Amino acid sequence: RKTPEQHVDDIRTVVLEAAKRKIDVNIYLEDWSNGIKHSPDYVFLVIDALKGLPIRRFMLPDTLGVLNPGNTYEYCKMMVDRYPDLRFDFHAHNDYDLAVANVYSAIRAGIKGIHTTVNGLGERAGNAPLSSVLAVIKDQLGEETSLREEKINKASRLVETYSGVHIPPNKPIIGEHVFTRSEE
């Protein structure tokens, strides 16, 4: 069993070797959501030790999908405020059907990068769906992205075809019935 300092030394060695080889490095803090909830001092120890290294992005995953919009905002804001010069990405899992809401909270907290998947495909209950996140960024947060919205539906249908995972007709943004309505 290694000490936290030994883990940091291992990471430092790999990051510096990658830099020598001109390889860009991102750090994925596996199970960050549980770490920041139950062992924030450990999370801070790791980031404090690595923050001066040539790391492009620190990935903050909700690996088990345990966060909600309230604590997503709280924990992401904590990271952004404590480390204003670092670039953080948020990676949501959808175990409680909160991935998109958690992404919304992460962006409001100052997170600059968001991980999504087409149609929300991913392990267990999936990840934040690109189509929904794009709509939230534009319509709820009033922000623009460089994504070409007109291509989303085609990409979603292509992924549906090749993955064999069908898009529910009532799926927000991309479901075939989402823009229909019935009146009494």
Regions found by a protein language model. Give the residues of each.
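Short glycine/serine/threonine-rich phosphate/pyrophosphate-binding segments
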Residues: 96-101
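Glycine-rich phosphate-binding active-site loops on the catalytic face of alpha/beta enzymes
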Residues: 109-126
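Gly/Ser/Thr-rich beta-alpha loop segments that engage phosphate groups in nucleotides
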Residues: 67, 122-124, 128, 166, ...
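A mid-to-C-terminal "edge-of-domain" accessory segment
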Residues: 142-184
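C-terminal helical cap(s) of enzyme catalytic domains, especially alpha/beta-barrels
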Residues: 122-149
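Alpha/beta enzyme core
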Residues: 1-88, 103-111
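Generic beta-strand/beta-sheet core signal
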Residues: 28-30, 61, 89-93, 114-119, ...
